[in-house]
Amino acid sequence: MARPDTVIPDKPESPYPIVQDSVVVSGFGRGSSELGIPTANIPINDDLNQLETGIYYGWCQLKPCTLPDECKTRTNGREVIYNHGKNLRNDDLKVLPMVMSIGWNPFYHLKEKAAEVHIMHKFDDFFYGAQIKFNVLGYIRPELDYTTKEALIEDINLDIKIALEALDRDAYQTYKDL
């Protein structure tokens, strides 16, 4: 399936905005290591599960927790430290733009539906276990299968560009207050 044209409305339209609170969990680690596009994975709840698979955009904000560090094992056997966001800096705690993929990631042949938030910001540390509040303001495109990793990366970068252009509009800026 070819990438469809994306038409972003002048302002969010029903059913948006969708506002969610969640916690960042570890995924497979491929967003950072393989694609150079890190993601904050979040559990799929009933509200997210009802959305069409595909790419969405909106705003998000991280909040650290005061829980102690803990070591958890990913499904691939690698251990990760849940620091609950305690190393986040002030700049990391601002409301930031995001794109979110909801779906099966056909390129990676996932067996479970995943929700992956790419926060458009450079972080110095991981923040597994941190709280994340976000709003979904619109839909960019359906989930697609790719024949190459390069094509996937190119499309993700286009999604990011589209999201940033949409979120720069005054009507979308008003939703920055999470």
Curated annotation (Swiss-Prot):
InterPro entries: Riboflavin_kinase, Riboflavin_kinase_bac/euk, Riboflavin_kinase_dom_sf. Keywords: ATP-binding, Flavoprotein, FMN, Kinase, Magnesium, Metal-binding, Nucleotide-binding, Transferase, Zinc. It holds the Pfam family Flavokinase. Disulfide bonds: none annotated. Coiled coil: none annotated. Catalyzes the phosphorylation of riboflavin (vitamin B2) to form flavin mononucleotide (FMN) coenzyme. This is Riboflavin kinase. It comes from Scheffersomyces stipitis (strain ATCC 58785 / CBS 6054 / NBRC 10063 / NRRL Y-11545) (Yeast). The gene is FMN1.
